[in-house]
């Protein structure tokens, strides 16, 4: 499988992210590292050390993946991430993009 098809099954804890769009305008442009994930929320540690909890459903996230030596940035709609992390790994994902 290609990298693009595995993104939704990837472990998110430890990844750097930026919120690129959200219905809560205060969250847009927030950057940090994912430190915990629940069914509906991501806990993000911002660069200043503060922790915030962000609902997955209302945001679009830009994750930074380190694939070998080339970092990749990928935008993911938070609605696709809803669910417990361990269940998301098992879930069948409809092909959304013709990669």
UniProtKB/Swiss-Prot annotation:
Record keywords: Cytoplasm, Endonuclease, Hydrolase, Nuclease, tRNA processing
EC number(s) from the headed UniProt entry: 3.1.26.5
GO cellular component: cytoplasm; ribonuclease P complex
Chief localisation class: cytoplasm
Record-linked Gene3D superfamilies: Ribonuclease P/MRP, subunit p29 (2.30.30.210)
Class in the EC hierarchy, top level: hydrolase
Annotated SUPFAM superfamilies: Rof/RNase P subunit-like
Subcellular location: Cytoplasm
Catalytic activity: Endonucleolytic cleavage of RNA, removing 5'-extranucleotides from tRNA precursor
UniProt-recorded Gene Ontology molecular function terms: ribonuclease P activity; RNA binding
Database matches in InterPro entries: RNase_P/MRP_Rpp29_sf, RNP1, Rof/RNase_P-like, Rpp29/RNP1
Biological process according to GO: tRNA 5'-leader removal
Family that this chain belongs to: Belongs to the eukaryotic/archaeal RNase P protein component 1 family.
Function field: Part of ribonuclease P, a protein complex that generates mature tRNA molecules by cleaving their 5'-ends.
Subunit structure comment from the entry: Consists of a catalytic RNA component and at least 4-5 protein subunits.
Name the UniProt record assigns to this protein: Ribonuclease P protein component 1
Native source species: Methanococcus vannielii (strain ATCC 35089 / DSM 1224 / JCM 13029 / OCM 148 / SB)
């Amino acid at each position: 499988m290609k990298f693009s098809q595995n993104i939704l099954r990837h472990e998110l804890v430890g990844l750097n992210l930026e919120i690129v769009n959200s219905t809560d305008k205060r969250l847009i442009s927030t950057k940090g590292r994912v430190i915990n994930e629940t069914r509906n929320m991501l806990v993000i540690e911002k660069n200043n050390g503060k922790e915030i909890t962000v609902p997955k459903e209302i945001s679009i996230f830009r994750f930074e993946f380190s694939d070998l030596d080339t970092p990749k940035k990928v935008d993911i709609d938070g609605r696709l991430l809803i669910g417990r992390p361990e269940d998301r790994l098992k879930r069948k994902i409809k092909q959304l993009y013709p990669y």
